[in-house]
Amino acid sequence: MSEVFEITVQPGGERFVCQPQQSALHAMETQGKRCLPVGCRGGGCGLCKVRVLAGDYESGRVSCKHLPVEAREQGYALACRLFARSDLCIERYSKPCSESTVDQQQRE
């Protein structure tokens, strides 16, 4: 039997298991979970961006546009290219509100 790791998604604490050869996103989808957004599944769109809060992992190839080196050094990864090497705690990425978004919300 192969090794299995548990991934906990914050906020909310939803959990799913992941095998070492599966991406975190693929493992989540196969278990019918919806705790992370799903995009291209190929590392090119950045929609499934997460921050690894705890645990060991490896990352596959991703678009530098959506995940620059500085972000990777701060623990950010794309779930579609995130391979657990231990139990992980990850955090969903939320884009900071831009002024135009705030202005638009205030007008509504």
From Swiss-Prot:
Ferredoxins are iron-sulfur proteins that transfer electrons in a wide variety of metabolic reactions. Pathway: Aromatic compound metabolism; catechol degradation. It comes from the Bacteria. Keywords: 2Fe-2S, Aromatic hydrocarbons catabolism, Electron transport, Iron, Iron-sulfur, Metal-binding, Plasmid, Transport. Residues 5-96 form the 2Fe-2S ferredoxin-type domain. Belongs to the 2Fe2S plant-type ferredoxin family. This is Ferredoxin, plant-type. InterPro entries: 2Fe-2S_ferredoxin-like_sf, 2Fe-2S_ferredoxin-type, 2Fe2S_fd_BS, Beta-grasp_dom_sf. One of its GO terms (biological process) is catechol-containing compound catabolic process. GO terms for molecular function: 2 iron, 2 sulfur cluster binding; metal ion binding. Gene3D superfamilies: 3.10.20.30. The keyword Electron transport applies. [2Fe-2S] cluster binds at residues 40, 45, 48, 80.
